Amino acid sequence: MLWYCRFKWLHHTTRQQVAQRVIEQHQAGGGRRPASLKGWYNLAGGGAGFLLVETDDPRELTATLQPFMDVVSFDVHAVYAVDYDQRIQELQQMVQQGH
């Protein structure tokens, strides 16, 4: 399952605190990118962004995010990919059937 994990720095969080926490967790993970981390995106302007994390176990997701919860807040949602052409075809059929 893919999880969209929007994050926002807490009010008094500093760039130094975030950098330190990320490096601590990176080193704790053996200096490697976590296999479950599929994407890391920052919003323009800084202080917010989102992670894409793939795991079938929500407890694993929680364990991944918890070390950061004193410097950022998370808004987490399960997501899935949509095949654009297939979805358009389904919606066209729905419109034609009047549903």
PLM feature spans:
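Conserved, structured core segments of small domains
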Residues: M1-H99
